[in-house]
Amino acid sequence: MDASYKHPVVAVVGPTATGKTALGVELAKHFSGEVISCDSMQIYKGLDIGTAKVTPEETCGIPHHGVDILTPDKAFSVADFTAMAGKLEEEISARKKLPILVGGTGLYVQSFLYGVRFTEEKAPAGLREQLAAELAAKGGAAMYEELKQADPEAAAAIHPNNQVRVLRALEHYRATGKKLSEQKAESLPPERPYRSLILGLDFPERAVLYRRIDLRVDKMLEAGLIKEAEHVWQNRESFRTAAQAIGYKEFFPYFEQTAPLEACTEKLKQASRNYAKRQLTWFRHMDGVVWLDAGAPDAVQTALRKTSEFLAKG
């Protein structure tokens, strides 16, 4: 094989509630593919409803990797993801199958496709404890404000309430004196490791997306989200990442009897809409995304055609 040959990889990206899972399955059916999930929460076992995890029925028998691999008390970083996804890509390609990335965690998708090399610096002794103490004393908003001043680019990619990632970014900055974005630039290889097609799903009218998000939340509640969220709340000290996740933390005031269920539900819908906006901002800044109208009757056919053309160029 030509030494310059690069494995083809297809990615399906976009904000929440745009039909990424279904499109990924359709592509896998037509092009003999296997799916690698690019969702930072779907890796956790037992967090099924709040993460909109793909169901066995929805997979239609297509292998889905990177789902249900850790218990919620375990940490999982973008460096962990790129290592896992790199190994999966090799295995899938060796089986003569097409690797299809599906998910809305932009940092995961971009880091993998761009071949970012992560080096895990060891934090100075006591730094993590110091940051945790500062968080307890000052609050999350103050810590996020510090990150905005130190590393605006990293802050823009992190939700203010995601205290785990805020502290991790601050830890990196204080330990190395460098921004995360600087590390990322230094760790980029001279050329990308894969030949990729990135399909982005979105709706031309924002109101359509927001209605779909609201409907999805209602369906999650019907499916038993409250019970799942209560389990996270009861284990919030050990389920650190899950306790910060959209879909769970919005209901904590309800369990603490400080807010009615209706108010918490509305808060979740608003948080999900805001998250969709941040996802769109991220993916709009990525190079080479081929955007598709998720609501168009021929959206799947267009995606199949684009993928067929992409593979034919190989």
Regions found by a protein language model. Name each.
Residues M1-G314:
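Phosphate/pyrophosphate-binding catalytic cores of soluble transferases and nucleic-acid-acting enzymes
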